[in-house]
Amino acid sequence: MRSFFPSASFGSPLAITGHIGPTRATAGDSASESAVRPTCALTVRAALMLAAMTGLLFFAPPCWAAEPLLAPERSIGAVVDHYLDEKLKAAGVSPAPAADEATVARRLYLDLVGRIPTASEARRYVAAKESDKRARLIDELAGSVGFAHHNANEFDRLLAYGNPGAPSLRPYLLAAFKEQRPWDRMFRELLGLGAAPEKPETFVLKRLGDQDALARDVSSVFFGLNITCAQCHQHPYIASLTQDYFFGMQAFFARSQDFQGNLIERQAALPATYKAKDGTTRPVIPMFLSGETVALPAVDAAEAKKAFDEESKRIAELAKEYAKNKTLPPPAELNLRQRLAELALSDANRDRFARSLVNRLFHRLYGRGLVMSLDQMHAENAASHPELLAWLSRDFIDHGYDLARLIRGLVSSDAYARSSRWDSVEPPAPGLFAVAAIRPLTREQWGVSHQVASDPTKITAHERLDHPHMEALVAAAKSYGTLIEQPYDDLQIGVNEALKLSNAPELAKSTGAKLAAMLAKLPDRSQQIDEAVWTVWSRAPSSDEAALLAAFLEQRSTPPTESLQQMLWALVNSPEFRFNH
């Protein structure tokens, strides 16, 4: 067996000495992968022919399903396995075997509640004899408060879209996941079309000063298409994605305004234009990615200016009295953000809205999206498994955009539980999903898991409690998490992270202090080592690992508790802890 790590096993001397980062072989689409795409190519060819007549090439589904889909009553996990296995067979590739039970348990805890399991939780799962124990664990974790906290972290990062200055929407997201709000409702609320007390409209409010970024982020996050390249010229890869689309998406927010911290829609607006690449001046018309436009009343420029100025004066007067009476300007007859939501969720367009989120969740849980890159979902960028993407999107829509149901289904497949180890020199193409991806932990996952490994009683005390205690745990984890990089595709752990961790005396001092004290009370060395490895790595140590750790402790001249803490520090700084494998 060959591991993706630079040694034969996670618990090697390299791991103990604090080596960080896998040396994973990377490969593009192999010949075997591309050879099984004939129906996909035909679909793209048909889309190209249609585009020549309609001019809507880029919005055509990304290699949409060429074959009839499986029946809707099939389970999500079974459908994932069917389509992935079908392509593996066509490519002549046998998948990796199932991961061991301890690895599956750790993977589920990290993906569903954002932390490693405690030693007792991991042991309990491995020891359980029920044939449906994995399904039971998924139900338990998805029904816990940790599920809401973890998804609040994950979606907060998604909505920030890589902008470190983006406002945190975590309080809103936490409430939304606790109440199990569907994704379409959350979309409306984030556009300022609901009455959520946690102010999700901050997503728009804090971007009003940069409407270019607002148009980009809305298109990318919710519809899987980054339209930035069309801001100044025709998109280089999508022939029909012109400047009209960029400014058309931007126009949906042209009347939005920050009024004393409230997102309002103005009634009046000045006619807007932009200078096209060919030098002509063109009017800005609200236009969705489908090419559908919103008709605006024709007005004389002078009359529009007069109406705009008069409304501005009324808004200014209301602002002066807002502190006293909290009176908002009257709602506009035409709310362009409302029209954007209606267009996006219409029967004709909702599949794009659904596919974008499905693809992002698949990427999060499997290490790769069905379409890569995640914000380049268009007809010229084929999905690796178009029928699977189509089925999952249809299922997501048919079940009311239920996020928890989709996540639970995705982690129920056999493919999700595959081993991350491969027994040949080169692993198969990533797009085949033949072997589990090794995924770096997010800052939040690493920070909370670090606390669990250092003092497992924190979870015992707080895992079932609500907001205040869990929030304290998350807040403490964030201070640790800043020492590591947030994951991105093809991340390679660099020397900077190793240096930060090597020069964090307060972290080193706190890591495992309480656990080391607990271990020191155990009667013999083998029990200490066994408990340490179960706590940090969520599994039993191998005989070689146990011998290595015993030798390490025997060589220490420091007090027993301090020696144990040094051992724990090495375990926490190993690749096995840093990655979800």
Residue ranges and their predicted role:
Residues 45-62:
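Bacterial N-terminal signal peptides
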Residues 313-314, 327-357, 363-365:
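Structured secondary-structure scaffolds
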Residues 4-5, 10, 58-59:
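Aromatic (phenylalanine/tyrosine) cluster motif
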